[in-house]
Amino acid sequence: MTNFNIKAPNQSIEKSLIEKINNLNKPKGSLGRLEEIALQIGLIQQTLSPSLHHPCHLLFGGDHGIERENVSVSPRDVTWQQMINFTQGGGGVNLFCRQHGFKLRLIDMGVDHDLTAYPAIINHKIAHGTANFLHNPAMNDEQFQRALHIGATLVDDCFAEGCNIISIGEMGIANTSPSSIWMSIFENLPLNECIGAGAGLNHTEMQHKLAVLQTAVDRFFAQGYQPIDAIPYFGGFEMVGAIGAMLRAAERHMVILVDGFIMSACMLAASQMHPEVLAYAIYGHCSDEGGHRKMLKLMNAKPLLSLGLRLGEGTGALCSYPIIDSAVRMINEMNNFENAHITKYF
């Protein structure tokens, strides 16, 4: 079993960080969210001079048994086809990783296809997709623990290379379904308030998806499961891998850059296991997927961008990175009033 020892950042440095930010040559609070981000990263790293080094993006791939119930407009073959596309540098995630200097790691957690011919994809396949949670738990406990461990060890590898900020993405057709269910169960909301169109379902298809997922949730509770059991019961291998990565990153006091609906749902699930993980999360964007805005509000999360994105892969998180970089540069490179020989006027 993988254990995580996560502590909330020590707040003793907070006053000094705020003083440093307020003494920069600007009206207090005039750089808004940049000041908040600089403060958060300073607390995470326990320093008055936070920094970003060797950013890494982990992209976990996996298929879902629930896809067999026609809850997604995209066929499951798209998962493996896109994973191969990523090895060729042709995906949105590739572009933004190149643009912003992220090292990209592709991980097969449970894609329903043999990808061993592609050495750029790290083979951690647990199974050829999860079980169909309409009828059975998506994974057993051994698979759940294994997925957590894989995610954690991948972060350990990044940390050993000097990485202190991690971004996480996913590729898994139908993974909006477990995300919606987690949101419903963990936030105690009706499922119809948490469901979205995924890759583009129409109204009739949405109603079918809702009926399938509601039946699965009803069966889950009828069997006496507790809310925390929803993580392995409904989750995908790629999603649990992401949770393990988030928890280990928090344990190592790394910044966690959270993407859209799927990754926010993973952070929500991670917080059910270790609430302290939330202090390490920066939310890159609010996606166009139904339910994400409400989820972020319930998590007291403030996304940096709202661009109508719903691609996944971690693309929205990666697009927000320059803002985070600007916040760190602000606290380190901007003159204070004394150095700039400017009268402090507040």
Task: Describe the residue ranges of each PLM region.
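N-terminal loops that bind phosphate or other acidic moieties
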Residues: M1-F346
